[in-house]
């Protein structure tokens, strides 16, 4: 009715298709079996050990204290929110051994130990910079900043002159898209810890297809 194809168009297409079949001609572009793209990541070295095998992840106390100092040091003139300032002060005391280390500080120290050892860290999710329950604080905001786009400081990006990259992305409420992207990113970066964090437990439901189709069966299926 719209004139997209002439009246005899479909019949002619079928006839031509059958003529090609009768001649034994290939009607599709062949896919090369066993082809390996030059930029394909070789995961073979990482498949020799089981994930339940013991691994020494200890960090010397001297190094933990050094990293703690870096995690609680801010640029001159950087003004913290009063509640966040208290958290930073408590973390400094934790690094000095004056009070027990809490979950948020332990997490930041773990990331820091990876970053100075040559392993990148990348976190994404709706509220990962602060942490949904106010625990992480990987990103700090200057209360005297002139505009929203400026005045953000990430201690994990400033541990030492030579370190691996740290990124934290407060992503939009599109769990499936974000997790799918991060899965692809992680697949191409074996030396980087890539984390997607659902803001609340049921938010993972929006990304369930990616979990089922790619992550749960990743090694066996893909």
Model-predicted segments: where are they?
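Flexible, glycine-rich loop/tail regions that form catalytic "lids" or insertion modules at the edges
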Residues: 1-222
